[in-house]
UniProtKB/Swiss-Prot annotation:
Heme binds at residue 347. It comes from Pseudonocardia autotrophica. InterPro entries: Cyt_P450, Cyt_P450_B, Cyt_P450_CS, Cyt_P450_sf. The keyword Cytoplasm applies. Its main location: cytoplasm. It catalyses: 5beta-cholestane-3alpha,7alpha,12alpha-triol + 6 reduced [adrenodoxin] + 3 O2 + 5 H(+) = (25R)-3alpha,7alpha,12alpha-trihydroxy-5beta-cholestan-26-oate + 6 oxidized [adrenodoxin] + 4 H2O. Activated by partially methylated beta-cyclodextrin. It is found in: Cytoplasm. One of its GO terms (cellular component) is cytoplasm. One of its GO terms (molecular function) is iron ion binding. Keywords: Cytoplasm, Heme, Iron, Metal-binding, Monooxygenase, Oxidoreductase. This is Vitamin D(3) 25-hydroxylase. The gene is vdh. Hydroxylates vitamin D(3) into 25-hydroxyvitamin D(3) and 1-alpha,25-dihydroxyvitamin D(3), its physiologically active forms. Also displays 25-hydroxylase activity on vitamin D(2) and 7-dehydrocholesterol. May play a role in the biosynthesis of steroid metabolic intermediates.
Length: 403
């Protein structure tokens, strides 16, 4: 648990009531303590909460993904840069090389071609949901669409999807270290076996494309790089979108004026999804960075060798960037937010997440115009994760289907 005191108020960070509504704590930090050193289980971490600081930090080469900057200089050469060659844990030129290779398969055109299939999945799920009685919308809808999409995209067999989703949740939530290590081992082993099957029985899915991809110099992804990339795509490819859908649906259910606007003009769904990403960001904090040298943000100097977290959810509600940040407005232009990062680490799957959000939320409210929460807001339970923000469950009454 980390505690911040601002004025006469105390705010728990990453514990207690924080999970239900973190925004008062973020607002207090932005106003009076925007570069805050926190005591977390993995060690002290500096949290940046202002939009300008977070956006600048994404492109600051002094903030490295190389954990060895926390070690004395004479010990660094004997240690591996990262325990697994995952792109989001790398600096250039290693990051540049992997991004170039993967980008050949993960194109905007390929993502846009998925829209008919995403719509088919959403409509099929909606057709099977009852009109009465409580339904857990997270489990039966928000979770199902991204999982089916990313598994089909990568070529993961349907019978394996529940296992991989369970491992992913353990890795993303604030689970015990032993549980995380066990889940990582199981996921690594599963993906290694799956990639071997793809070598002998290739298909038209993304994993087979990654096996075949090479650049003009003949460079290819190694086996460990392939496993790490598959792991990243599987986890990031559904965790963000599940929470985008859930948070977006809840935002509309709790803001009837905005729900009415969308019902009257369904073309607002694109700007609505951008606003959902800003208003209740599905990714709360970016992965840890390490200071390669002293850095200064908002007048506070962070020494070399320290860990730094970039507060995406806090930055996206910064009034210095977005007027009236605590008001939901699906007609505003929320582009420019740091929902998916910024710079060289901008999320490779941002286009797909936005597309899934537009289809899932748009089809849901068009199909079930009387959709309503089945419990009070104080009964909703959020996941306890420093990385993502989303509901564990969302009991709803679906209501009759539209004519």
């Amino acid at each position: 648990m980390a505690l911040t005191t601002t004025g006469t108020e105390q705010h728990d960070l990453f514990s207690g009531t924080f999970w239900q509504n973190p925004h008062p704590a973020y607002a207090a930090l932005r106003a009076e303590d925007p570069v805050r050193k926190l005591a977390l289980p993995d060690g002290p971490v500096w949290l940046l909460t202002r939009y300008a600081d977070v956006r600048e930090a994404f492109v600051d080469p002094r903030l490295s993904k190389d954990w060895r900057h926390t070690l004395p200089e004479d010990q660094r050469a004997d240690m591996p840069a990262t325990p697994t060659p995952m792109m989001i844990l790398m600096d250039p030129p290693d990051h540049t090389r992997l991004r170039k290779l993967v980008g050949r398969s993960f194109t905007v055109r390929r993502m846009n071609e998925l829209e008919p299939r995403i719509t088919e999945i959403a409509d099929g799920l909606l057709a099977g949901l009852p009109t009465d009685g409580p339904v857990d919308l997270m489990r039966e809808y928000a979770f199902q669409i991204p999982v089916q999409v990313i598994c089909e995209l990568l070529g993961v067999p349907a019978e394996d999807r529940d296992d991989f989703s369970a491992w992913s949740s353990v890795l993303v939530d604030d689970s015990p270290a032993d549980d995380k290590n066990a889940a990582m081992g199981k996921l690594h082993g599963y993906l290694s076996d799956l990639l071997e099957r793809k070598r002998t029985e290739p298909d038209d899915a993304l994993l087979s494309s990654l096996l075949a991809v090479s650049d003009e110099d003949g460079d290819r992804l190694s086996q460990e790089e392939l496993v790490a990339m598959a792991m990243l795509l599987l986890i990031a490819g559904h965790e963000t979108t599940v929470n985008l859908i859930g948070n977006g649906v809840l935002a509309l259910l709790t803001h009837p004026d905005q729900r009415k606007l969308l019902a009257e003009d369904p073309s607002l769904i694109s700007s609505a999804v951008e606003e959902f990403l800003r208003f209740d960001s599905p990714v709360s904090q970016a992965p840890i960075r390490f200071t390669a040298e002293d850095v200064t943000y908002s007048g506070v100097t962070i020494p070399a060798g320290e860990m730094v977290m970039l507060g995406l959810a806090a930055a996206n509600r910064d009034a210095d960037w977005m007027p009236e940040p605590d008001r939901l407005d699906i007609t505003r232009d929320a582009s420019g937010g740091v929902f998916f990062g910024h710079g060289i680490h901008f999320c490779l799957g941002a286009q797909l997440a936005r597309l899934e959000g537009r289809v899932a939320i748009g089809r849901l409210f068009a199909d079930r115009p009387e959709l309503a929460l089945a419990v009070g807001l104080d009964e909703l339970v959020y996941r306890e994760s420093t990385l993502v923000r989303g509901l564990s469950r969302m009991p709803v009454t679906m209501g009759p289907r539209s004519a």
